[in-house]
UniProtKB/Swiss-Prot annotation:
Belongs to the ABC transporter superfamily. Drug exporter-1 (DrugE1) (TC 3.A.1.105) family. The complex is composed of two ATP-binding proteins (DrrA) and two transmembrane proteins (DrrB and DrrC). It is a peripheral membrane protein. Part of the ABC transporter complex DrrABC involved in doxorubicin resistance. Responsible for energy coupling to the transport system. Binds ATP. This is Doxorubicin resistance ATP-binding protein DrrA. Keywords: Antibiotic resistance, ATP-binding, Cell membrane, Membrane, Nucleotide-binding, Translocase, Transport. It is an enzyme of class 7 (translocase). It holds the Pfam family ABC_tran. One of its GO terms (molecular function) is ATP hydrolysis activity. The gene is drrA. Inhibited by reserpine.
Length: 331
């Protein structure tokens, strides 16, 4: 792939804190094409926000390089800043100003004339369905409206790269869908997007590729379907109507339920999962055995691994992350 197709090129980036004792990022490399959406996933403290901070020139890497829209984040930070938009969980607009005033202010800061800034503000208020609230102080906006005006300010001049750090956290479903639609529009405009999110179904729906990072290291990369395939084959999920019947179901399934799956059951378990390489045949046989044992079920179905399964299978437990943090691994 030609370099001019690439909006983001990260090569061997390393970042440490505490005089090198805490490794936030360790030899991270990836590329993002123009118009591509990359989902950056990982548990808390994995290094996602540190990566966004480096790519947006808020902090410098200790080693490695990162090129954004042709500009080096260390030697050409001004060029990088002219080429990007960044939105995070904290809205970065002025609550004392109206939505329109914020947009005009950003336009003027970008060097637009007064008339051009007002015209662009009107266009963005229309695009983000905020015309009715344009004259109101942003401090009176709802969470979804505040997030939309924040993103709109980042689009006063179209960026080449967008960094969206958990943009839908805390939003209601309607506002969240509006952000999803916005990300889809970025693709059409050729804007490369790096999305961090705590909602795995969001990454599944929006991302062309997903990068899974844990303890500062990329542990998996690929499309959502490729990562799901790595997490395992189709499995059968069985939910009893009465949780007291779990042991009876285990007995009825017999050899269908592998020993290590039996060992995973705890007093708090509310369902049984087992591999189903034969798909529907396994489901039918399991249902037959349970029916013969006269056990009532709330549900029995074939499932495919979701990104939740990928996440749980490939990343460490948050309590382990705390242990690594104390001992000098990722931030």
């Amino acid at each position: 792939m030609r370099n001019d197709d690439m909006a983001v090129v990260v090569n061997g980036v390393r970042k440490t804190y505490g005089k090198g004792k805490i490794v936030a990022l360790d030899d991270v490399s990836f590329k993002v094409r123009r118009g591509e959406v990359i989902g950056l996933l990982g548990p808390n403290g994995a290094g996602k926000t540190t990566m966004v901070d480096i790519l947006s020139t808020l902090t410098r890497p200790d080693a490695g390089s990162a090129i954004i829209a042709g500009y080096d984040v260390v030697s050409e930070p001004a060029g990088v800043r002219r080429s990007i938009m960044v939105t995070g969980q904290q809205v970065a607009v002025d609550d004392a100003l109206s939505g329109e005033q914020n947009l005009v202010l950003f336009g003027r800061l970008w060097g637009l004339s007064k008339s051009a800034a007002r015209k662009r503000a009107a266009e963005l208020l229309e695009q983000f369905s905020l015309v009715h609230a344009g004259k109101r102080r942003v401090g009176t906006y709802s969470g979804g409206m505040r997030r939309r005006i924040d993103i709109a300010c980042g689009l006063v001049v179209q960026p080449q790269v967008a960094f969206l750090d958990e943009p839908t956290t805390g939003l209601d479903p309607r506002s969240r869908q509006a952000i999803w639609d916005l990300v889809a529009s970025f693709k059409k405009l050729g804007i490369a997007t790096l999305l961090t999110t705590q909602y795995l179904e969001e990454a599944d729906a929006l991302s062309d590729r997903i990068i899974l990072i844990d303890h500062g290291i990329i542990i998996a990369e690929g499309t959502a379907n490729e990562l799901k395939h790595r997490a395992g084959d189709t499995f059968c999920e069985i939910v009893p109507r009465d949780l007291k019947d779990l042991d009876a179901i285990v007995a009825a399934l017999g050899s269908l339920l592998p020993e290590h799956h039996r060992a995973m059951l705890t007093p708090d378990s509310d369902r049984i999962t087992m591999p189903a390489p034969d798909g529907i045949r396994m489901l039918v046989e399991a249902a037959r055995r349970i029916d013969e044992a006269r056990i009532e079920l709330a549900d029995i179905a074939l499932r495919r691994p979701s990104l939740d399964h990928v996440f749980l299978a490939m990343t460490t437990d948050p309590t382990e992350s705390l242990t690594h943090l104390v001992s000098g691994s990722a931030r």
